[in-house]
Amino acid sequence: METDKYVFFHGANKNQAGVHIFSQWFPVNFKEYLNGEEFAEYVSAEQYMMAHKALLFGDMFHFKKIMECSKQCKIKYLGRRVRNFNPTIWDKHKFDIVTEGNRLKFSQNPDLMKRLLETGNKTIVEASPSDKIWGIGLTAQQAVNIPENKWPGKNLLGKVLMKIREENQQ
């Protein structure tokens, strides 16, 4: 759903507005390089996030399981099982991890970058009623009737996407 001020998205199922591409679960391949060498290939930004969560906490077992998986719900499940998880440490790193994953996703897929840039200066909003961290904790239909400063969620994913958009606007 799109308004004059907002671009709302939720879920990776294809829709006419093309906003499903903003979802962490949207299936798209992209690669990560370290020192000029290919380090890993991902099937979604969700896989990147959960793999880097496992790396952050030194859990190579779950890192390998996450990298072997292509089903988004299973990737999320495995990410929630990362050993040695510390929420304070995760909170310090999660925004940067998700930003870098999405930066790779959009920079390596020009059609996705084009759609991101087409949002102009609108506020990009993950309208997930069940997510108050990455989303706003409301549906799009609920959000349009509530002032933005009253939304219960942080919309971190929307902020990530707007940061990447700003980096690429001319």
Curated annotation (Swiss-Prot):
Keywords attached to this entry: Glycosidase, Hydrolase
InterPro entries: NADAR (IPR012816), YbiA-like_sf (IPR037238)
Keyword Lipid metabolism on entry: no
Coiled coil: none
Enzyme Commission number: 3.2.2.-
One annotated GO molecular function: hydrolase activity, acting on glycosyl bonds
Catalytic activity: 2,5-diamino-6-hydroxy-4-(5-phosphoribosylamino)-pyrimidine + H2O = 2,5,6-triamino-4-hydroxypyrimidine + D-ribose 5-phosphate; 5-amino-6-(5-phospho-D-ribosylamino)uracil + H2O = 5,6-diaminouracil + D-ribose 5-phosphate
Pfam families: NADAR
NCBIfam families xrefs: ribofla_fusion
Function of the molecule: Catalyzes the hydrolysis of the N-glycosidic bond in the first two intermediates of riboflavin biosynthesis, which are highly reactive metabolites, yielding relatively innocuous products. Thus, can divert a surplus of harmful intermediates into relatively harmless products and pre-empt the damage these intermediates would otherwise do. May act on other substrates in vivo.
Family: Belongs to the YbiA family.
This protein's name: N-glycosidase R617
Organism expressing this protein natively: Acanthamoeba polyphaga mimivirus (APMV)
